[in-house]
Amino acid sequence: MMTNAYLLKRGRQGLDPVDVHGTLEYPGTVATDSGAYQILEYGQVGVTPEEIVGYQEKINTDIGVILDVPTGFRSDPSRARWTVDETVRRADRALEVMTRNDILWMGPVQGGVHLKEVERSAREMAKRDFAIYALGSPTELMETQRYDVLVDMIVAAKKVLPRGKPFHLFGAGHPVLFPFLVAMGCDLFDSAAYALYARAGRYLTSEGTQLLGDMVEFVCPCPACVGTSPEEVMRSQDKTGGTRLAQHNLWVCFSELRRVREAIRKGRLWELLELRSNAHPALKECFNRISQYAEILERSTPAVKPHGIFYLGSSSDNRPEKVRFVSKLPGSVEERRKLVLVLPGRWRRPFHEDPRYESVAKAFDDHPKVSICFYSLAWGPVPIELDETFPIAQTESSDAGDPVLIGERAKKVSEFLQRLHPKSVVLVSDGDYGRAVTKELSKTFAKRILTIFNGERLNPDAIVKSVERKLIRNA
């Protein structure tokens, strides 16, 4: 639970500080903000950085925040630079007067939409030993649905902050954003959006926001929604309806957090991002911006996961596992072999166990002069050496052909084979994808090098015998 230490102090002027857990009647972890939001709203507050630190220590907060100066959304570069410098100065003042090591102190990063200032702020805060680091000023970005800019801000801060410390995002309260924020490395959030939205009759879901007046019935199974209707909640809005709606909004926030954690456990967070990205154009922009940082995400993605992955089309091409595979592909095959046998990578995983081509792959798997490579719609060129590795053999994908995607994959296959400098290439063409690969390889390799077999017409034994004859001629 999070509350505002500045408002508590102002509301109890002249009274001795009391334990915040007792004030809230809540025995769990309590975090207290320092009044920075009030600075953003009103320009100043009547408290010093030293005073608010001392007050938070006296009320026994569990997580405390120094009194920073938010940059906001509309600050120009000069103002942004000043807020960063002033926040650093206030951090130093706060650190000098802290006496309790049992409180987790939070160091805010400022800079707003000015990414160089965000990075500079994060670098300065990283020099100071805070238990938690946080990014400020995102609220207006979220209200205007500039989620792509928020992603840039998070990356600018995260790349210079200590990796072993939690990262908090102030004001992130809409469940639709949780999967995206977690994917970018946010560990903690706080927001009063669940209550503020409820006052305005706004109903939160994991796919967006709805107005009660536009709804006929609730599809949510939470206790606040079962047994009532949007019309009934609207009629009682001044009495209990606002509370009921706030309860639903809070419930859906916790539900989405549980869904995100479960997706992480199963190694399916990227699939959740793909699903959520189709709920709104702004979320699609957010997803596309995250995809641009795929190489950064790859560094912290486990090499092996408890479950396989889903390939859902071109939106899956920037998932961290795919980026890792592409980066390691060039060094996966020896160039010394004279003949490359290119087989279809169809529905069966691993590809060499495909009933139609299993005997062909088996016949040449250990041949000293043959390299086997599969062409997969999800992965492009897949050397047999990687056929049983994660996540190639654990990928579920649809082979329904997108002509653009098929063409792009065929080019990747051709580019990979070029790097092997083979004396001969034998392609077994199968389906639309096989025909696209045929077209690309025909552009790349001379007729004396390239041999093409129709896998849909020839039986496996005929293919094996033809390849053997090709090897004899090359000897």
Q: Can you name each region flagged by the protein language model?
A:
Residues M1-G46, E96, Q110, E117-S121, ...:
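Catalytic cores of glycan-processing enzymes that make or break glycosidic bonds
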Residues M1-R100, I309-R336, L343-L420, V428-A475:
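Non-catalytic, usually N-terminal nucleic-acid engagement modules in DNA/RNA processing proteins
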Residues L7-K9, A36-Y37, P70-G72, G112-H114, ...:
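Short, solvent-exposed loop/turn segments at secondary-structure junctions
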Residues R289-K322:
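Flexible, glycine-rich loop/tail regions that form catalytic "lids" or insertion modules at the edges
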